[in-house]
């Protein structure tokens, strides 16, 4: 009972502890085959801008994967742009509106060793409103043909304490299938997965801040434009 209480307390307090920190951070822990990664970045953008960025990502992940590569998936090497210890080719996604199930399909390549073609991952994609008026997006694994054994992720937008920006909070929990569980050690996880999670959350931050600057510049230009 005591252990269960401590676990619940940890889950409740973890996001608050992340928010309390004044710097961007990412860290991964490993226990019993599961990698848990906590990521946070401060975003100098309004609630509405941050929420719109997340909504755009959510929509494009469901219906227009290719549109994500110039911004949300930029620099993540998900289409074999450069050679690595483990490479990915993220081919496509399809979304079932009735069941809220998102299927992603791609290849996993270990250069010179083996290629696993057309690995699929079926996930339940949901979004729930939070008390601050934003929403948390959840991505939970339903089934996969080998690469991932278990996965649940959450992405939240949390207002900063001074109300002058927001925090993007990404929490990922993943267990790999038997072969990948052997291959992806704690050390390799950082070079295969953790840096991609960091790149992803910074991509969303950069997009939100870029939209903020562009919106401000447009307002300034409109203010100074000649009035007829």
What is each PLM-predicted segment?
Residues 4-18:
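Sec-dependent N-terminal signal peptides
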Residues 20-101:
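Hydrophobic ligand-binding cavity/cleft-lining segments
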Residues 33-34, 82-84, 115-122, 147-154, ...:
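Amphipathic hydrophobic-ligand
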Residues 73-145, 174-177, 199, 203-211, ...:
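Glycine-rich portal/gate segments that line the openings of hydrophobic small-molecule binding cavities
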């Amino acid at each position: 009972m005591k252990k269960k209480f401590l676990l619940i307390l940890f889950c409740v307090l973890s996001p608050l502890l992340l928010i309390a920190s004044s710097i961007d951070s990412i860290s991964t822990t490993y226990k019993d085959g599961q990698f848990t990664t906590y990521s946070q970045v401060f975003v100098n953008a309004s609630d509405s801008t941050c929420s719109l960025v997340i909504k755009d990502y959510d929509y494009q992940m469901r219906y227009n994967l290719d549109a994500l590569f110039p911004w949300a998936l930029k620099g993540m090497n998900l289409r074999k742009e450069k050679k690595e210890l483990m490479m990915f080719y993220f081919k496509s996604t399809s979304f079932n509106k009735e069941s809220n199930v998102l299927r992603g399909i791609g290849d996993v390549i270990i250069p010179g060793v083996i290629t696993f073609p057309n690995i699929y991952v079926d996930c339940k994609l949901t979004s729930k409103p939070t008390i601050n008026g934003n929403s948390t997006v959840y991505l939970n694994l339903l089934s996969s043909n080998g690469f991932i054994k278990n996965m649940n992720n959450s992405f939240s937008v949390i207002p900063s304490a001074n109300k002058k920006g927001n925090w993007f909070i990404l929490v990922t929990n993943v267990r790999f299938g038997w072969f990948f569980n052997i291959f992806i050690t704690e050390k390799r996880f950082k070079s295969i997965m953790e840096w991609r999670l960091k790149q992803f959350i910074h991509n969303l931050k950069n997009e939100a801040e870029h939209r903020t600057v562009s919106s401000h510049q447009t307002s300034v230009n409109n203010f100074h434009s000649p009035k007829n």
